[in-house]
Amino acid sequence: MIRYCLTSYREDLVILDIINDSFSIVPDAGSLLKERDKLLKEFPQLSYFFDSEYHIGSVSRNSDTSFLEERWFLPEPDKTLYKCSLFKRFILLLKVFYYSWNIEKKGMAWIFISNKKENRLYSLNEEHLIRKEISNLSIIFHLNIFKSDCLTYSYALKRILNSRNIDAHLVIGVRTQPFYSHSWVEVGGQVINDAPNMRDKLSVIAEI
């Protein structure tokens, strides 16, 4: 399993330690991320991270884009869609409890370990199904008694869509000065539960 995920934001290097569920920032090292020899020559203390299995993510397309740090808001349910039955809501809530409890207790490592690797295809006729599953999840998510944040919501949405044979990916983005991390879901390279230009605002440190 990958131990570290790395990316850069402006001049900063950001490291995600999956096992310890923590982020680290190394100022002025970001520009050397893709030049390993130069990076380790100038920052020899980073050799520890490169001796383990690691992944290098993508850099924000426009780090000058303003990004308002604010509390994450749960997506509003789509009132134009048919609401799922109470039984389905109950089953969905149990899944959310399971995902959020494990994320709260076991951290990022559990997400990587439990990630399913099946290859699935996406077609445009699945857009209605995606909208419906987002709406259904939003209806019950406020009842979650465990960790409720963008990571939990996005991971739950990814797993729900995967179970419907949709190749959804959890994406984790970061920025620095001040530090901020955020999670969203993409299908076919498109953001489905957040602003479409998230990759312009944040550097992607992990895709699951």
Swiss-Prot record:
Keywords in alphabetical order: Antibiotic biosynthesis, Cytoplasm, Plasmid
Gene Ontology process terms (BP): antibiotic biosynthetic process
Domain of life where this protein originates: Bacteria
Subcellular location: Cytoplasm
Job description of the protein: Along with McjC, necessary and sufficient to process the inactive microcin J25 (McjA) precursor into the active peptide.
NCBIfam families: lasso_biosyn_B2
Record-given protein name: Microcin J25-processing protein McjB
Protein's organism: Escherichia coli
Gene: mcjB
